[in-house]
Amino acid sequence: HKPYGVLSQFTPEPGSRWGCLAEHIPVPDVYAAGRLDADSEGLLLLTANGRLQQRLTDPAWGHWRRYWVQVEGIANPEQLQRLERGLMIQGQRTLPARASSIADPGLPPRNPPIRERKEIPTSWLALELREGRNRQVRRMTAAVGLPTLRLLRVAIDLMDGEAPLSLEGLEPGQWRAVSPQEELRLQGLLRRSPGRGGRAGGGKSGQGGGGG
């Protein structure tokens, strides 16, 4: 569970105010399969298997990633439909997504706290993407008039008919090894050919596996 203020890498950036994963995870020779921005939180899958890392982050495979997004304002049906249909972001249309309003998930307050304006209400969205362009979630919500205040990735769908890998049970900064069953599922990805779950558009949508 990557906390706020931590880069999705194990080496610090010189002069950066952000921390790095090595401050939280004492496991050598693993790397993030898909990044989260330093000001985002949530699920990172770490692996030493380069093929698995590539497989999970290749946008051509279209692994759904689920985010909880606290936004400024209250989403209306038209805004949700625009998020789902796809938006022009930096000259390129995003792939169709899944978007819905959700109740406050009751997360612990972020440290540092989000910046709220007393006169503007906030609300939560569940947003699922199959691609991961740079700061895509934030750009998408801003494009429909709902600036992002807080962003967490909560699940990654392995597209194998089983439940997605989930952040459940992990506090910020905590990590765990995958279970034997999860390990088998991940290895199964490397044996599967494109088909089940479908490809998401030939991989022309830019960097994969991020979005946050």
Which stretches of residues belong to each language-model region?
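RNA pseudouridine synthases
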Residues: H1-G195
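Intrinsically disordered, low-complexity arginine-rich tails of RNA-binding/processing proteins
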Residues: G195-G212
